[in-house]
Amino acid sequence: MSRGHNIKKSLTPQISCSTSESYKQLDFLPDKLRAKLLPFQKDGITFALRRDGRCMVADEMGLGKTVQAIGIAYFYKEEWPLLIVVPSSLRYPWTEEIEKWIPELSPEEINVIQNKTDVGRISTSKVTVLGYGLLTTDAETLIDALNNQNFKVVIVDESHYMKSRSATRSRILLPIVQKAKRAILLTGTPALGRPEELFMQIEALFPQKFGTWTEYAKRYCNAHVRYFGRRSQWDCRGASNLNELHQLLSDIMIRRLKTEVLTQLPPKIRQRIPFDLPSAAAKELNSSFEEWEKLMRDPYSGATETVMGLITRMFKQTAIAKAGAVKDYIKMMLQNDSLKFLVFAHHLSMLQACTEAVIENKTRYIRIDGSVPSSERIHLVNQFQKDPETRVAILSIQAAGQGLTFTAATHVVFAELYWDPGHIKQAEDRAHRIGQCSSVNIHYLIANGTLDTLMWGMLNRKAQVTGSTLNGRKEKLQAEEGDKEKWDFLQFAEAWTPNERSEELRDEMLFTHFEKEKQRDIRSFFLPNAKKRQLETSCDESRVSQEKNTIVPADPVKTATRGDESDLEPEAKKLKSVAIDDPCRPPEEQPCRPGQAEALLTFGICKAKAQATTPAFCGEGWQCAFCTYINNSVLPYCEMCENPRGGAVPQIDSLNQTQNKNKNEKDDSQDTSKKIQTSSDGEKQVLAHSTPEPLAKSKEEISTTESEDRLTPQPGDEQLKNWPVYDTLMFCASKNTDRIHVYTKDGNQMNCNFIPLDIKLDLWEDLPASFQLKQNRSLILRFVREWSSLTAMKQKIIKKSGQLFRSPVLALEEIAKQQTKQNSTKRYITKEDVAAASMDKVKNDGGHVRLITKGPKPGDPSTKEFLEGGECVPFLNPCTAQGDLILKASTSKGYLQAVDNEGNPLCLRCQQPTCQTKQERKADAWDSRFCSLKCQEEFWIRSNNSYLRAKVFEIEHGVCQLCNLNAQELFLRLRDAPKSQRKSLLDATWTSKLPLEQLNEMIRSPGEGHFWQVDHIKPVSGGGGQCSLDNLQTLCTVCHRERTAQQAKERSQVRRQSLASNHGSDITRFLVKK
């Protein structure tokens, strides 16, 4: 039965670019977005509007589907709230795009859902961003909140995630999309390999339009009964009537190819690299092939699971067999120093082999697989895009093959193939997309006599099916075969063995006592003691630091003053060049000593320990005639008041008036600082003590200031009259991106935002034309200078506060004042502490307590006494029951929670009622632990070490805050290196002075905890326990050992003084003048 007669004839999706009337509908868009859209993108928006906002935008990857979806959703903004469903790794890039193109949205109006219980802001936010990973069967609280919100406009990015009818996320999303009035589905590969993958997406947009699933499968999937032995199965993996399906899809789907609408984009050149494997490498694979051939001769001899399991095993064996050749190929490509390229693989074993090749070549790289957190992936992408020293990106086809941009690469290498052409094309177009300026060469490494040859044929057959369905014509992966003689060296590659299969560590692979007790560095005999040397050379270091800053101004974040850093410097760092990575500093500007070439080659950049001194101007600066501030000699304007160098001395009255004005502005800034959201709990002393001092401008700011008049277009008199002049501005930092939103001094939104790094690079396109005026521009420059002087942790504290502020430094002080002082000598909150707080709350205010657990096992005696089916335990006698309840709560897997007299469960953190007022299901009790995401985060930071490390790593990325060493990168390099090379890698770095057992443990089983720790700025012994993020910092292992030893020494001195005071008086008291 054909459904074609029941569907209206398709409107032509390709709207003429010359028809200006078609674009009049787009006048509603923000000016910046409308000016940025390309003609075919405007056609896509018009196509959706003609279909009342329900369609699929299926443009090929890299054609800008995101901005089209934002434009469509903006047309229906009166019908918001808007729900955006994306892969988990794309939540923050989507938030960045929303803030960029719709600047009228304030930061608090965009909600990025963090976990399955983060539902507090769904009902109040205009835009909600949700990751596919949270749509699981146990996310009942989240699913209920999404259904109750009744979203009228929904965007589903990478909608092919809904391809499976049986997947949980497909069943959850289907009713939400169907119920929405407007629904935009985005995907570059609607069908990855078969027509059956289209049905759920079509059903979400237009239910029953293509009939039931059975009707659709029979008509377009060639559905039939297939027998495996004696068992029958309904097979829907085929394809039929594809031309008819293509015609029907054109009514609800618009699809353009890059070759049709983006002809100026450089071409994509595919090439197959076939090679033969050495017989030793393919030994296991050959035996599996023989087993597979036996099954194929007698199809009744094995079940489907046996066949599929064998194919999966052969797939992995193919990866291991060709890994040695892949390593040699990558090393060959690395011989070209100017080449940046991507390497895609599927199995972890192949990813490991590719990583080893890069490490052995001593090249800087990034690696993204399923274990890398979503927030860290964006950081790694930016590193590859902007750092010229990072030449290779090793990527998982599934984890990094969608949504990310790697246009800095000109070559793509597929170390492995995958099962469908959709994933392959998605991975190809990470580099071949808008923004690519060079042709992209794609190399497929095909090992003859392996599963590769079969998979290549299968990929081309599937490509013909998807091409006929989506594009109306048969297609295949056009790839020319490379010169076989050119790649003959691959067949002589050595067989590769994964680390887990490698032989036991031999003695020569570990450090020994003899090596650790080798002679001291001869230079140490000619140097005084560390503290004496520090005093003698402090002036010289300051002068050298000032000279360095004069030539190449350093990053203000990395040159922040730390008074006790020299005391904590380990001997290994004083006598030996360390290999650390500083992407912001060119390699030619980083000092290297002779004899440290190995360290330089191993870690890419050789850099001396960062000097932590306050810039001192020993007579070489110039004094401002306006404010008398002594500036660096290279600055053309005063750093404090923006007065030009050499300017006339102002009149006294004018000076006094200006000073009074500045004083009033400072007072106003403290009075008018507006609180949008309460800040996190923490220690005022830490923030107040660590407020940064003014630092010298960075190179970008200097160049911006010097060339301001030259680069800024000179407006006419009429424009000058129309542009407003601001004497002060207010700012709000986005919680989820790097953008800063701009407000007037009255707190009114200016509908614009910017990224501080763009301003430092003299990119002002995100700000209105009125910021061409020097007075307006100076306000932004001053903010960027202060913001850049803060550490990443302090910036995060301001972001979390949600405050409106004039100065980030003053905002940090305000946050410190608002925080309650808390002193605790306990490192973490325990279950006993929670139980005691709950019992005290009930004792004082009434109510009862209950023990909440996550999925308690039936018949568990530890929970039966307190909890039956999620019910509460009434509070009886606090004098007799408290001790027993607390004891049993500490030994169980749950928490003792207080419930008030009205039946509302109270938050474990703040003892306030949570958002869950009525518990109807067992799962709700566990989800009602916290009243908000803020309380949940604060509780886990204070009680869970793994969560604490993850949050600090998200901000500081494993970089030591004392010596600026990238300890996380060293850990990844050592973890991914062959075991035989780990010893030499460690011996060339700062870790060489660590204890013997610790070094050998790093070689045997390296872990993050061996390389960096999360340290309390105010120590736990001094009352800094159970703290928030503001009292935490990342330290490498050497700095942490030194700081811990110093603190132990100080505590010992305090104890001795306290003991001595019990038996006598301090003699220094007699020397004090009365």
From Swiss-Prot:
Range of residues in the leader sequence: none
Limits of the Helicase C-terminal domain: 325-481
Keyword annotations from UniProtKB, A to Z: ATP-binding, Chromosome, DNA damage, DNA repair, Endonuclease, Helicase, Hydrolase, Metal-binding, Multifunctional enzyme, Nuclease, Nucleotide-binding, Nucleus, Phosphoprotein, Zinc, Zinc-finger
A cellular-component GO term for this protein: nuclear replication fork
Zinc finger (RanBP2-type): 617-647
Main location class: nucleus
Keyword hit for Thylakoid: no
GO MF term set: ATP binding; ATP-dependent DNA/DNA annealing activity; DNA endonuclease activity; helicase activity; K63-linked polyubiquitin modification-dependent protein binding; zinc ion binding
Stretch list, region Disordered: 659-719
UniProt-annotated stretches for the region Endonuclease activity: 1006-1074
Origin: domain of life: Eukaryota
Enzyme class: hydrolase
Pfam families: Helicase_C (PF00271), HNH (PF01844), SNF2-rel_dom (PF00176)
Stored SMART domains: DEXDc, HELICc, HNHc, ZnF_RBZ
Residue ranges of the motif APIM motif: 1069-1073
Example GO biological process: replication fork processing
Residues spanned by motif PIP-box: 519-526
Entry binding sites for ATP: 59-66
CDD domains xref list: DEXHc_HARP_SMARCAL1, HNHc, SF2_C_SNF
Entry EC number(s): 3.6.4.-, 3.1.-.-
Family: Belongs to the SNF2/RAD54 helicase family.
The protein's assembly and partners: Interacts (via PIP-box and RanBP2-type zinc finger) with PCNA (when PCNA is polyubiquitinated via 'Lys-63'-linked polyubiquitin).
Functional note: DNA annealing helicase and endonuclease required to maintain genome stability at stalled or collapsed replication forks by facilitating fork restart and limiting inappropriate recombination that could occur during template switching events. Recruited to the sites of stalled DNA replication by polyubiquitinated PCNA and acts as a structure-specific endonuclease that cleaves the replication fork D-loop intermediate, generating an accessible 3'-OH group in the template of the leading strand, which is amenable to extension by DNA polymerase.
Alphabetical list of PANTHER family matching this protein: DNA ANNEALING HELICASE AND ENDONUCLEASE ZRANB3, DNA ANNEALING HELICASE AND ENDONUCLEASE ZRANB3 FAMILY MEMBER
Recorded domain comment: The PIP-box mediates the interaction with PCNA, while the RanBP2-type zinc finger mediates binding to 'Lys-63'-linked polyubiquitin.
Name recorded for this polypeptide: DNA annealing helicase and endonuclease ZRANB3
